[in-house]
């Protein structure tokens, strides 16, 4: 059963619309659906709400520590409420999936994602769930001829807003993720994964 859903992103209005904040977009939608408001909670170093989602009590968190310090926020809340790593779902932007794709998985490496890297270090475990929201990779935007010599600027890419057509399909993928949340919060994660990966 998932007791904590974390969305990763960077704090500040200048980052709100950037690809790296896809995790925040999901949490904002969940809070709206639950009719709750995230509030600044200093002891958790983030914006926090306790929500009732599909009959289950769930904690929602958006760390306000900047991406590479996300673990500080996650572990503060997890320790306070005695939440185990496998009861945590972290929603994050995923370079290795195209826009419009969203996948669930338990455990694994960070894939170069600094937020995941820090969460793993703070929890001393990789065994937490991830909701991977595809944003694509900058190499996908480079022409074949230019690709040979070009090194894609990942840092610049994730800190820019998606193009309109990308935003539309990312929004649609978040809607699909929201549709499986009843299963997720009830602990039916295998079923949720199958449904999400079928779409």
Curated annotation (Swiss-Prot):
Q: Which reaction does it catalyse?
A: an N-acyl-L-alpha-aminoacyl-tRNA + H2O = an N-acyl-L-amino acid + a tRNA + H(+)
User: What are the UniProt keywords, alphabetically?
Assistant: Cytoplasm, Hydrolase, RNA-binding, tRNA-binding
Organism of this sequence: Burkholderia cenocepacia (strain HI2424)
| TM segment ranges | none
- What enzyme category does the UniProt record give? hydrolase
| Site features described as Discriminates between blocked and unblocked aminoacyl-tRNA, chain residue numbers | 10
Record-linked InterPro entries? Pept_tRNA_hydro, Pept_tRNA_hydro_CS, Pept_tRNA_hydro_sf
Per the record, the domain of life is Bacteria
**Keyword field contains Cytoplasm:** yes
- Subunit architecture: Monomer.
Active-site residues annotated for this sequence: 20 (proton acceptor)
Give the site residues for Stabilizes the basic form of H active site to accept a proton: 93
Which Gene3D superfamilies does the record match to this protein?
A: Peptidyl-tRNA hydrolase
Pfam families with a match to the protein in the record:
Pept_tRNA_hydro
**Similarity comment: family membership:** Belongs to the PTH family.
- Subcellular localization(s) per the UniProt record: Cytoplasm
Q: What is its EC number?
A: 3.1.1.29
State the PANTHER family in the record: PEPTIDYL-TRNA HYDROLASE
Chain positions recorded as tRNA binding sites: 15, 66, 68, 114
Q: Name one GO molecular function term.
A: peptidyl-tRNA hydrolase activity
Q: Which GO terms describe its cellular component?
A: cytoplasm
Briefly, what is this protein's role?
Hydrolyzes ribosome-free peptidyl-tRNAs (with 1 or more amino acids incorporated), which drop off the ribosome during protein synthesis, or as a result of ribosome stalling.
Q: What is this protein called?
A: Peptidyl-tRNA hydrolase
**UniProt cross-references to SUPFAM superfamilies, sorted A to Z:** Peptidyl-tRNA hydrolase-like
């Amino acid at each position: 059963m998932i007791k904590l859903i974390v969305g990763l992103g960077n704090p500040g209005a200048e980052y709100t619309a950037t690809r790296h904040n896809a995790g925040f977009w999901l949490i904002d939608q969940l809070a709206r659906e639950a009719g709750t408001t995230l509030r600044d909670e200093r002891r958790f170093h983030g914006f926090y709400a306790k929500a009732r989602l599909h009959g289950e009590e769930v904690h929602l968190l958006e760390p306000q520590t900047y991406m590479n310090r996300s673990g500080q926020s996650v572990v503060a809340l997890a320790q306070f409420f005695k939440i185990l790593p496998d009861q945590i779902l972290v929603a994050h932007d995923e370079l290795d999936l195209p826009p419009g794709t969203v996948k669930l998985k338990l455990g694994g490496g960070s894939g170069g994602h600094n937020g995941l890297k820090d969460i793993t270090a703070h929890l001393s475990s990789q065994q937490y769930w991830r909701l991977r929201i595809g944003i694509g990779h900058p190499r996908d935007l480079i022409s074949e001829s230019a690709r040979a010599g070009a090194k894609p600027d990942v840092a610049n890419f994730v800190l820019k807003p998606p193009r309109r057509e990308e935003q539309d399909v990312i929004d649609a993928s978040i809607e699909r993720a929201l549709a499986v949340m009843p299963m997720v919060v009830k602990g039916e994660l295998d079923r949720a994964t199958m449904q999400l990966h079928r779409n």
